[in-house]
């Protein structure tokens, strides 16, 4: 693709962490093709982060039912979607497409240069996820991209166009906006804690979180923002009873962009191997990430101010003392 010509589409599904480690791809494309319209086909509640950071111009929903036809060989293709794909000069897909059926169908209706990237990094290569996702951009002579995800939130422009269905015009006012109530940082210094993840085996024991909160309450002047969603269940409510209500606040099941605004105002972050830890790192927060058995070389959150705490005994072997020492040195 020649600079300044056509539009670029990046197709990226996956969970929060999967999307965050793709942010360097958007940043590299912005740098290589300044002024070119850049769009992402993904899950709007996650991909909206890229729009909030002005890394993309438009977010389009990957949940369109008609998209399923593009994964069947020789089937009929939805006309609106076919015209949608035809509107791009460059399409980069990180979808799981082992037989190349999706690529084959897209190229039936679009003359765009199509680049297929990995939906997940190859564990055998031991290459960090951000670097694995940047590899396909070498076909565009992009070799020196910054592999660290960086998210600088920008207040939305009036009437911004962001989320829409493929092949349809964007709805005005659809942009995930900066929340009106962003006063976390206005009442002292806040420390964000995410005591959950997508898997229980990645979680530090709940009693350790209790001891940690009690110690930090006594030894510091921090207020505490407890972060979580459905995966945490009642854990946040249980932990919130440990401290006076004047020192603790829940941020549970917030829209992701709103959560990002809240996190951005915190002095630091403590969490597990989770997408929220990747988000905190991308926002530039100093952070402590309590790590278990996942391959750290591939999946560790990348950030200039992130410290990983681990032990030979897995995440359960990380002590409250280890975390307290990390808080003292980092925050």
What are these regions (language model features)?
Residues 1-331:
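Catalytic machinery of carbohydrate-active enzymes
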């Amino acid at each position: 693709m020649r600079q300044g010509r056509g539009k670029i589409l990046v197709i990226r599904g996956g969970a929060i962490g999967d999307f965050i480690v793709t942010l360097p791809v958007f940043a590299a494309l912005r740098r290589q093709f300044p002024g070119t319209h850049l769009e992402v086909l993904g899950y709007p509640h996650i991909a909206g982060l890229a729009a909030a950071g002005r890394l993309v111009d438009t977010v389009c929903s990957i949940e369109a039912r008609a998209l399923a036809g593009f994964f069947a060989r020789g089937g009929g293709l939805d006309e609106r979607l076919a015209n949608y794909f035809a509107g791009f000069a460059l399409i980069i897909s990180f979808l799981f497409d082992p037989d190349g059926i999706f690529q084959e169908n897209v190229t039936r209706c679009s003359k765009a240069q199509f680049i297929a990237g990995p939906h997940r990094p190859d564990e055998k290569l031991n290459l960090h996820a951000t670097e694995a996702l940047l590899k396909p951009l070498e076909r565009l002579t992009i070799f020196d991209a910054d592999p660290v995800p960086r998210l600088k939130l920008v207040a939305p422009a009036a009437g911004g166009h962001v989320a829409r269905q493929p092949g349809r015009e964007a709805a005005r006012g659809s942009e995930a906006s900066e929340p009106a109530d962003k006063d976390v940082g206005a009442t002292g210094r806040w420390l964000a804690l995410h005591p959950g993840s997508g898997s229980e085996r990645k979680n530090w024991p709940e009693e350790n979180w209790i001891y940690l909160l009690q110690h930090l309450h006594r030894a510091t002047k921090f207020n505490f923002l407890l972060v979580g969603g459905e995966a945490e269940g009642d854990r946040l409510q249980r932990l919130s009873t440990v401290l006076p209500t004047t020192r603790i606040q829940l941020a549970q099941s917030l829209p992701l962009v709103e959560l990002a605004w809240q996190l951005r105002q915190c002095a630091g972050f403590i969490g597990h191997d989770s997408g929220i830890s990747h988000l905190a790192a991308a926002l530039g927060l100093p952070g402590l990430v309590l790590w278990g058995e996942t391959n750290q070389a591939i999946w560790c959150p990348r950030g200039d101010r992130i410290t990983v705490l681990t032990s030979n005994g897995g995440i359960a072997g990380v002590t409250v003392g280890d975390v307290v020492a990390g808080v003292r040195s980092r925050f």
